[in-house]
Amino acid sequence: MRSDMIKKGFDKAPHRSLLKATGLKDEDFDKPFIAICNSFIEIIPGHKHLNEFGKLVKEAVRAAGMVPFEFNTIGVDDGIAMGHIGMRYSLPSREIIADSVETVVNAHWFDGMICIPNCDKITPGMMMAALRINIPTVFVSGGPMAAGKTSKGEVVDLSSVFEGVGAYQSGKISEEELKDIEDHGCPSCGSCSGMFTANSMNCLCEVLGLALPGNGSILAIDPRREELIKQAAEKLKILIERDIKPRDIVTEEAIDDAFALDMAMGGSTNTVLHTLALAQEAGLDYDMNRIDAVSRRVPHLCKVSPASNWHMEDIDRAGGISAILKEMSRKEGVLHLDRITATGQTLRENIAHAEIQDKEVIHSLENPHSEEGGLRILKGNLAKDGAVIKSGATEVKRFEGPCVIFNSQDEALAGIMLGKVKKGDVVVIRYEGPRGGPGMPEMLAPTSAIAGMGLGADVALLTDGRFSGASRGISVGHISPEAAAGGTIALLEQGDIVCIDVEERLLEVRVSDEELEKRKKGWKRPEPKVKTGWLGRYAQMVTSANTGAVLKIPNFD
């Protein structure tokens, strides 16, 4: 066993003595040591219940004849961090999480790991660590939150609350109505109830094969979560016995399938960023062109909030992720069904008995929302290395208009609230990329303000930053190269005409190459917004969004 490094041999007497101080007995040294990587944090509603989850996981691990050791990671609640400097720490926290898990697991030579994530950056951070460490691992997330209902019976979620701010600001609803939405938008523990980033990543974790069937859709408050925990411990023991590791599971084909599900469900654009980062950790050569190829062959079968009024509980009721995958498998070439997963079985075996229970929620191949996926990769002279749009969250497929430029999210939000943006405009928010932000903050507040003011179909928004999974409308993010790297977005001037063509996958500014080259010669990179602390270091090390915004390792040659 891997853990023999710290528990076998006469020279490990000091190690065993320390381990006995934690409560271990001599007989425990013949059992696998299992890391329970938890993320219990009281300020994050998606993680508030994970303390109890951790106890259940440890009980299940002991029942399976193994020895559990629980530790915790940090986390950031993107909703609470939204709209201020806290959001700049969100994406960088992914790297800290990955590094901290690597540190604890490799320092103590665990034989296997069960990860308990739930929200936005915690799930991908732990997944990156699992691929980096590469010991048998199973994920069990905390589960989605239920949708809420206002006093009038209207179904609401966190996206409704953000959009309610814009609606109140523009006089569309009263303060009392806003308070009603606020009070009911987040009714329980769990990851926010729509197809936002957290749920998108937990669903992708399931199809990648790192989590068990049901992981993405079973609600946090559903007793079936406890059964999932028991299964996770049992399956982990099998993975250890068969020496099946994350890199055996997360192959190029598995990433294809993850993006295929993403396209079928119209997931968060953040999945592109995080899954590209996973590919980097797995040592795979996977780029945005391959994502685009997946998008072209996968139909859009589900619309979940913010693209509709359906929520994760509806997906679960309609058959869950397995039912979506089973339907997708009917189309040749969409999925790789014979690859291994954390169940110890193939994807084909995992979904064999799944069926769609409600075709209003999960559409059939014969009745898709669209013939192509709910996310699209755009390219053009404004995004030579690519950009991402959640095409399933807007009915507008082509938009052209003059750009209104803001050099920060705060500046943009103030401008939107002051009425500086009108119908037909293209809002540009730049210098908010991985390096320029720093931290590539999400633009939920501006997109929600635009939607809440009734301009969601009449105003486009472009950024080198990110969008929350709760964002909707004509929102193009992850523009690469970013402004801080001298990308074309940095060269735009007020009033330049920008064209977004979703069907043709184009993002262009109507300015000649000669004029852009002239502007570039006169461009100067702004001073970094942050020069000290973690964000200062992050800004110096982070790479582009089109490679997952991972950190580059300095060249010591």
Curated annotation (Swiss-Prot):
Binds 1 [2Fe-2S] cluster per subunit. This cluster acts as a Lewis acid cofactor. Mg(2+) binds at D78, D120, K121, E442. Pathway: Amino-acid biosynthesis; L-isoleucine biosynthesis; L-isoleucine from 2-oxobutanoate: step 3/4; Amino-acid biosynthesis; L-valine biosynthesis; L-valine from pyruvate: step 3/4. Belongs to the IlvD/Edd family. SUPFAM superfamilies: IlvD/EDD N-terminal domain-like, LeuD/IlvD-like. It catalyses: (2R)-2,3-dihydroxy-3-methylbutanoate = 3-methyl-2-oxobutanoate + H2O; (2R,3R)-2,3-dihydroxy-3-methylpentanoate = (S)-3-methyl-2-oxopentanoate + H2O. Gene3D superfamilies: IlvD/EDD C-terminal domain-like. Its EC number is 4.2.1.9. HAMAP family: IlvD (MF_00012). Coiled coil: none annotated. The keyword ATP-binding does not apply. Functions in the biosynthesis of branched-chain amino acids. Catalyzes the dehydration of (2R,3R)-2,3-dihydroxy-3-methylpentanoate (2,3-dihydroxy-3-methylvalerate) into 2-oxo-3-methylpentanoate (2-oxo-3-methylvalerate) and of (2R)-2,3-dihydroxy-3-methylbutanoate (2,3-dihydroxyisovalerate) into 2-oxo-3-methylbutanoate (2-oxoisovalerate), the penultimate precursor to L-isoleucine and L-valine, respectively. GO terms for molecular function: 2 iron, 2 sulfur cluster binding; dihydroxy-acid dehydratase activity; magnesium ion binding. This is Dihydroxy-acid dehydratase. It comes from the Bacteria. The modification N6-carboxylysine is found at K121.
